[in-house]
Amino acid sequence: MTCVVAIDVGGTTLKGGLIAPDGAILHRERRPTPRTEGPDRVIAAISAFVADLSRPRTVAGTLLRPAAVGLAVPGLVTSEKAVFSAAFGWRDVPAAAFSDGRLPLALGHDVRSAGEAELAHGPGAADALYLPIGTGIAGAVVLSVSLYGGAAGWAGQIGHIPVRPGGLPCPCGQRGCLAAYASAASIAARAGETTAEDVVRRAAAGDEPAARVWAEAVEALALALATYTLVLDPAMIVIGGGLSLAGDALVAPLRARLAARLTFRPAPEVRVSALGVDAGLLGAGLLARRALGQQGGGDVDDLGA
């Protein structure tokens, strides 16, 4: 069976998979992201992962033959290069750096690709925001059932909206960014925990320091999302990424705080992603299928056995 390679690059984990023509995930692998070892080490790890997944393999008795690669990465991204990533210290890394050239590779923004998968999966809204929250925060802006990239393709950098001017430093160079207060990584770090999940658990058990960090994160999210709502009027805000696993512990207070800030109009619906943590991987699969079509290998629906 012909398939595509999909890799979703996260701040802590590289999620890889082989995706069937119908979008089913046939094979999964995860590897740690060596973020603390420097920009070049992350590029090398991604390149090795691409090479390994690009080899034919037999899964459940079926020979899988990868035909293209989709690579979804964080930061400011074009189809030709990763322009900037605060998480990895990248500047102007060409797409070719992630591959040996054996298969066509499509590079795309992780959140926008995940948003495209979420939009394709449905049901959704004609005007919405897909907001995965993990190591960082960025959004996929959906306007009139289409993803909106902006003038340079960089729309949706919600994680760098200042919610506390002069506040905590952010790797982007600003202070007081939303990501400095409400990303999963910042929540864990500020509460002295390994993961945001640990902070949620402590807060639910009545631990005051953890509850304070969690409340500040929710308030920061509500402030940024109120600003977004007043500008673009979404019908729905979809929370994804690792922090979405908090479920009602996140969604319930966020709905309440968002409604409290939008004093003269109703708040948009806030819900958790239907695709969960697979949205990024499936979005990378869509990138790969597009690359295959551009190489003359067929459209997304033309991949055959």
Model-derived regions, located:
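Short beta-strand scaffold segments in enzyme catalytic cores
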Residues: 14-19, 75, 137-142
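Glycine-rich phosphate-binding loop and adjoining helix at the ATP-binding site
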Residues: 34, 39-47, 51, 62-129, ...
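Glycine/GP-enriched mid-protein hinge/lid loop-to-helix segment characteristic of carbohydrate kinases
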Residues: 30, 37-41, 104-108, 117-210, ...
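Short glycine-rich, Thr/Ser-proximal phosphate-binding strand/loop in the N-terminal lobe
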Residues: 2-44, 62-64, 82-84, 153, ...
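Conserved beta-strand elements of the Class I
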Residues: 3-7, 129-131, 170, 238
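Glycine-rich phosphate-binding/hydrolytic loop that grips phosphoryl groups
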Residues: 19, 110-120, 245, 249, ...
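Adenine-nucleotide phosphate-binding core of ATP-dependent small-molecule kinases
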Residues: 35-55, 59-61, 180, 186-238, ...
